[in-house]
């Protein structure tokens, strides 16, 4: 049997569909698989060159149908795209398809990573495909599209990405897949209208593994014990908040669900994996008990690990949110709903039938189970009242019944559960919306971008009234982009004949008193007054956007665009990777020039502007506010304020919002000029800035704010800040400190969680084997640490940050903290089996010593600072002091270490003291972080 599907492709000729179908069916038979009727029907229709909508339950083999389409496409020289909503699933599919078609033929693009992007088979998120479709349309090199989890079409925030390809890729054939599509009649008609191909819906409600349902009125722990005892584990316990999931994981450690042999197998599977973040020890402890945690707040590497352990059957319980209900291929025998109501971002209500079936469908997987179980817990107050009633009957005493929660709760009972089981998924609703990113992508096309934008709105799956709203918003966004020169007109050279022709047309137009505006070849920008008048008064039959288009189109009667015609272009002077993905990116571009680059805190203000256009990571801001309140409460108690006064003052407090007056005033002015911004709001905050100003590492920040359960939230925020700095801030606005911020953030993000690219490089080895014989380990397992010293600039930025952590300890007279920032002075945690510090090799470190071998102690540092302060007021830590010109790096002759001298900047600007460090490069590579030794602090002379 050939090793991969790629080996089955005929090399001597372009094969026909019959030949390819036969070879694919041979492949299926060779793997001892038997196609379900729906699978067989869908594959046959695909080989008849039809669009297919595959609406079958979870576990019914939709992935194999998609693989058949990829096989057909690659064999016949057509490019196929696989999309889905979850980056982790895109990564998983990428790895699986690399095994079947070879890594040279498969690419990846998720926004976080891009590998072999021009490959004949591309795995990407739906947003990536939508951007390709918007930018290139019918010219895009896309012939086959697989859209997995297509029910995301109805997602409020992201649904437009699933709709755009259906509007703009007439050259492509589509395979739409989901377990919860509902009525597909509309999409059948739209696909055929788009590409002229017949569209077939293949639907089935028959599950390969049947489900049994039960409603439980036992306490949650007892329900789990019962399920485990009955052999119904692994159990996926569904929560709708990350906090509840984490609390349950901790609570369930009191339940013994694993045998000694199973725990030993878990310990072996975890060997070599680096639980190096602050939350790592907790996750490792739960995993040793056979309990996994899965939600979006975790670092990606932990989610991948938990998924792989579950695939091996090593986990008995997974406490998660509904994220596991979307596409991740994890074998679960039982799904247990802790509640049947959910907050959907606007209100709390009973689960939709689609959400219920999507999550419940994870129960029971072919090849693992002969049936699956779906269990719903009664509300907690109902279970408590049943226990009280039993106690009352037993004791003969009356009890006070518990009442349902007043907030974030909608009551449910067994009949609710029964109704959800029987209910079909709701019809998918359009979520089309016009954004800056959409407009820029469409206007970037080689052809007539304005006409393409008109057609996009005209073809979208909205009502006529909604389309008019989209037209107005597109017009407003277009004027904003033009005003800010993000898009601009190119004025061509004109002959005298063309000028006369233009003037005559204008005169004729005015004489007829036409409302439409014909093209003018002399400069005719769109002023602010025209924008306001056009929107306020409304234009006749030709919409506002159509009127804008008429200013850009060539002269009537011309074919294409000639030399004398006015053109529109996206400003090519912006850096190549400039991005407008953030809704308020235009505000950022508008405001950066208002900040004086000569200000000492210019870089910090710019960083705050960047953070202000990003969504609020609420859990981090709440933790910040808690600390602000704690400090204020302590101050007020010292001042003797009474309780009511203290409470009144606490209500006035906010989390840190640096430069908020400047940000709010500039944003209000911006909003006055751009009506569309009313849908958005500015959100000043200080997270990345606080980390940079206080020289904190990722782990420092997590511990300081007790954010262990939200490490993934912090990582995502930092990643977004990094991307905006890199892609949205013009290069001309970046000084050395801003570039160092980029290096600092990029280096931190890579150290915390990385390595998809490393996995791909491993697979490029000609000797790589398929997953059945050699497993691809999760990131962080059985891998040498990344060479942190390879990128010299990023490594230097990380060293400088560590040095300023040390200096900050000196400035605030926290000499123990200063010593702790040195690699030799790192204080290990109390000994424990799962110690992260032991796994990093830091448990047996000796006290730090200077160049002469004398130990550094808190008393010695105190004496050194007293000597310094006899000559200088203090050590400065302001932006000037952090300038890279005050840091001197000298590599050793043997290339095993660096000598780093940091000038101690003082208010008097004498700058006659320095701190000298040795950076051990060998140790740094081993640990994945700079290994610093303090050699001396003292005068230059």
Residue map of PLM features:
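Conserved segment of the helicase C-terminal RecA-like domain
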Residues: 341, 352-390
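Conserved P-loop/Walker A NTP-binding site and adjacent catalytic elements of P-loop NTPases
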Residues: 25, 33-208, 216, 234-239, ...
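Conserved two-lobed SF2 helicase motor
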Residues: 118-133, 289-300, 310-329
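Conserved C-terminal RecA-like helicase domain
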Residues: 81-83, 91, 98-107, 242-317, ...
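Non-catalytic terminal extensions of ATP-dependent helicases
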Residues: 292, 312, 404-518, 528, ...
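A short beta-strand element within the Helicase C-terminal
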Residues: 317, 324-341, 372-375
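Conserved interdomain hinge at the start of the Helicase C-terminal
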Residues: 216-240, 247, 304-312
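Helicase-associated low-complexity/disordered flanking segments
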Residues: 1-44, 48-52, 260-288
